[in-house]
Amino acid sequence: MFEVDLRSDTVTRPSRAMLNAMISSPVGDDVWGDDPTVLKLEAMFAERFGTEKALFCVSGTQANQIALMSHLSPGDEVICHPYAHIYNYEGGGIAANAHSSVVFTGDDRGIMHPEGVLSCIKADDVHYPKSRVLAIENTSNKGGGTCYEWEEIEALRAVASKHGLTFHLDGARLYNALVAKNQSESDYGTAFDSISICLSKGLGAPVGSVLLGSEEFIHHSRRIRKRIGGGWRQAGLLAGAAIYALENNVDRLAEDHAAAKDMAEFLGQQSWVKNVVAPETNILIFGLNEDMDQEAFISTLAEKGIGISQM
C-alpha cells in the first residue's frame, strides 16, 4: 500500500463520515425495486440532470455496456474516439456484448469534432455497418482529463440529431468537467440520450455508477442489467456512500484540479522531465527524458511509498 497513491482517482477510500452514512442507510432489495436508498439515489440524479429515470450500476463499464447493448443491434456501428474507454478498456464489450463495430475520429487530446464525425457516418448501403451511436467521453481519460466546451457538445448533438444517431456520454469523470467548466447538469441531461457517471473516482464512493436516460431506455437497461448478472440486493449500503459523495464531495474536485496544476508546475522545472501535458482537471501526464527508464522510475517511487501509473 502506497503512502501517496497517484496511480488513479479510483484508489480512493471512504472517509469516516461516508462509512457512517453507509451504516445508517436503510436497505431493501433492489432487484425487487424496494431499496429506499437506491431509489433515493436514482431520483436525485434524475432530478439533477432532468432525465426521466436513472439506474444504479456496479461500475462505469457495466453502465456503458448496458447502454450500448440497449442502443445497438448486431451489425450496427459506434462512432467514438480512438482513446475511448468503451473501446480500449471494457474487454471488447462492444463486439462481445453488442455485436457491433467501431469507427474512430478525434484529436490527440481525446476530443471529437463534428467534421470528423460526419466523415464516419456510413451511407445507407447494405455493404456497410449501420451508423447508430455517437459516443463521447468527458473528461477524456487517455486525453489527460480534457473537457469539452459546451459549444462543442451542442455541435455534436446537432450532427447526431440530423443523422439519426443516438448520443451517449461516458461521463465517468463528468463532475470534474462540470466543476472545471462551470457547466450545468441539466444541460447535459437535455443534450444526451444516455449518460453514465462514475461515483467511485474523484467523488470517492467505494463502488458504483449511474446510468441516466428516458423511462423507456432505463426500463430496457434494467432488464439488461439483470441479464448480465447486475441485479443486486441490499445495494442501499453502497447507494448511501454515493449519496454522501454527491452531497459533499463535488465542490472538492476543484482541490484535485489545483493539486494537478501545482504538480505540473513542479515537474516542468525538473531536468529529467521531457514534457508535461497541461492538466485541465485531475489527470496529469508527463514524459521522461529518453535516458530515463520508465519502469525503473516507477519502481524507485514505489520504494519511497509513492504510486504512479504508466500509460
Protein language model regions, located:
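Conserved C-terminal alpha-helix-loop-beta "cap" of PLP-dependent enzymes
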Residues: K261, G268-M311
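Conserved N-terminal alpha-helix of the aminotransferase class I/II PLP-enzyme fold
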Residues: P14-G60, H81-Y83, Y87-N88, G93
